[in-house]
């Protein structure tokens, strides 16, 4: 069995358990994914199953990409590789669905965080800023010292500064599957996941167990 699938973030909502407690959940459209290539140790040096997600028209892909996907029988926008318990269980063209997940199972969700652009240290790192009163004029959100008192003077290593924030790969681990809706390819997981709506995500079995 392959360890994960591709999907897209739909959004957040809430459901109620048997006792009436509110559970915040994220809805993910998972699959259907198509096996596009089998990586073998003899040919590639490692074992993995490559899958594709989200059908597109031919004009959206280059000719080499179209040739690569010819064996799968479908033109797909996103390709990713996952490990599998036994790659012999899969062959090119197989369709994988959300039914591989079950309620109560723990999963890891990998996505790309929202890009925030160039941000200061207060927003990017949670700095407290300078004093608000007693003559302070322009140090409200400044980073403060970045190495004063060093000899020779230099900026200390790993000093947190302003810079580009977000748009990075983020993994959220051990989220609980609340419900699976196979007829609509939907997976409901407890809590939030990284990224914007419609963003590509990878959902895999939790690597740290339940």
Swiss-Prot record:
GO biological process: translation
GO molecular function, one term: structural constituent of ribosome
Gene name, Swiss-Prot/TrEMBL: rplC
Assigned protein family: Belongs to the universal ribosomal protein uL3 family.
Subunit structure: Part of the 50S ribosomal subunit. Forms a cluster with proteins L14 and L19.
Cellular component aspect of the GO annotation: cytosolic large ribosomal subunit
Swiss-Prot/TrEMBL keywords: Ribonucleoprotein, Ribosomal protein, RNA-binding, rRNA-binding
Superkingdom of this protein's organism: Bacteria
Protein's name in the database: Large ribosomal subunit protein uL3
Function: One of the primary rRNA binding proteins, it binds directly near the 3'-end of the 23S rRNA, where it nucleates assembly of the 50S subunit.
Region entry Disordered, spans: 125-151
Annotated signal sequence range: none
Pfam families: Ribosomal_L3
